Amino acid sequence: MSSEAAREILVRGARALAHADAVGASLESMLGVLAETLDIESAVIVVPDGSDRMVIVASVGLADPAIAGLAEALHDPGHPIAKTVVDPVPSFDVPPTRPGGPALRSHLPLTVTRDGTTTVLGVLALAHHRPLDAESRRLLEATADLAAVAVERHR
């Protein structure tokens, strides 16, 4: 990945965080720049809705039927996105648990730490065809941090 691509991700992500009025618009802008600059076919941001359910608050690259299917799959506590909320550790380049789409998935927790306490606010989930290099992973982690701040800001 070029340093120009990295700069574009961080600049546009920071601008989306600072200037979007709604959380969905801010997050979709962040996802859009990821899809444009990295080899990401689709991306979603999922947050707990206050109960035991998860909701998709932003997506890019997914048709409505795929979004509906993912929303249904999130009811399964064994789904990788649901597992990332419980065990907030990034996973990269893992095969999908359900057929269809790109060959690999990556899941990054959206966390913030306040007063020494870390809170999981959601998950950045990506579908892609090729493994992610170390620099791409670092940029995705930075984007997940920006997304976490956006979610926290609008809670």
Question: Where do the protein language model's features map onto the residues?
Answer:
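Acidic/proline- and glycine-rich, intrinsically disordered low-complexity segments
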Residues: 54, 64-90
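GAF sensory/regulatory domain recognition
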Residues: 31-35, 44-68
